[in-house]
Amino acid sequence: DFGDAVVDLNEGNILKNFQYAFSTGASIDSNEITGRIILAETGKTDSTLFAVLYNKQEDSTVAKQKPMYVARVDGQGNFRFTNLPSGAFYVYGLGDVDGNKQYNQPIEQFAFLDSPIVVSTTTPSVQLYAYAAEKEKPKASSSASGDKARGLLVTPNLEAGALDLLDSFRLRYTKPIRKFDPSKTRLVIDSAETVNNVIFLNDSTRNQLIVIAPWKAGNKYRLFLDKEYATDSSGLTSIKNDTISFRVKTEKEYGTVRIRFSALDTAAHPVLIVYSGSDEIIGRYPLTGKEFYRSMFKPGNYKLALLYDTNQNGVWDPGDYFSKPKRQPELVQPLSNPLLVKENWDNELVIDMNAPPKKQ
């Protein structure tokens, strides 16, 4: 399989998927395997993946030996092996990060079938679901959280100076906070009254301070931060007084959402996943019935999907090829119905689960 390696001499046009077959015997093998690889976590496809074939299965084979056959995956997730001999083959999908066509990094996408495929002239198409056993760790940021001239920098999670009623008020820092003095802070409502019983909590990364207070919708607040109220892990501290002014949104700035599902299999433990326009997960909602309702939902355009949550922990879980028994990944099904939420509006959507699946 030459892939895209063959081009014409004058224009450089690619001769796509060119294959050259030859035989050392009197005939050429004519069997084939076709299939598709889908990313289990998103339901999408990835044209950088490969499908690979082995004629034996031991847990270490895919990590230590080169495959017998390799096929590229196209933009629809499809692959095809041609000119195969008769016999049994083990089919895998691989996101080959290091270029060695072996599965030896847990951050690589990987897919496997539970049993071998017996190749003949009528071999059925196969479906594989790829997963990464571990997430790729983000690279450490080389940027500092400030400098000695400016001091410690803080970024509140406000939208145009407003606090989301459905979110916590958070103060974000680029480095973990090592020292914090709440006595050097003061929260004021409507420019006059001091708010008592304000609690500051460090999140698990210590890069955020969560501010807990009895917020009142529609009111204006100011958070006063005196100098040296906080110090990060590099020893950088706030060198001057700071004030964060904001308001809390009102309920009218949200919409209600009602989604009705037809033919939804609740026995499969579906979880509704809501994505922002940039594919960031903004909510996961286990579905115990065929209707989802929220009295307050942030306005915007959203994408939807269903996670079939086998172990009922509320999040997607990858597979495990090396466990006993092997475990396939949980599956996510993208839904073709977009969700548009308008402010101060009853937003309704009906989703037919019997409708044709979304094209990738």
Sequence positions of predicted segments:
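N-terminal targeting or signal-anchor segments and their processing/structural boundaries
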Residues: 1-360
